[in-house]
């Protein structure tokens, strides 16, 4: 018996004018999620999703390509203005922000939401290379 082909469900196009761009820039990767005001994800991308592997994921260029991809997906849903929340110490922080501006979004605010410990857990030992 032949199996019937699976139907691809096309996501319905939301009509959202403003959103929040969450930029998570770690030392190893850059992940960007664009959500609505309630936190429901509209579009997302990461340097690894864009085909960068290994140490290339942590470059500013990878973050730029990733931000352009997420921005284009969000623009299809009608997003025009963005608040940007940047988290982490990675190299892709500023380049992702510039790429979102270059896509054509009006950025209303930029917040740094990097978690800072109040002397939490012991840090990892120093690397000896």
Swiss-Prot record:
Domain of life of the native organism: Bacteria
Record's GO cellular component terms: ribonucleoprotein complex; ribosome
GO BP term, example: translation
Keyword Ribonucleoprotein tagged: yes
Coiled coil: none
InterPro entries to which the protein is assigned, alphabetical: Ribosomal_uS11 (IPR001971), Ribosomal_uS11_bac-type (IPR019981), Ribosomal_uS11_CS (IPR018102), Ribosomal_uS11_sf (IPR036967)
Pfam family, one: Ribosomal_S11
GO MF: rRNA binding; structural constituent of ribosome
Cited NCBIfam families: PRK05309.1, uS11_bact
Family: Belongs to the universal ribosomal protein uS11 family.
Full protein name: Small ribosomal subunit protein uS11
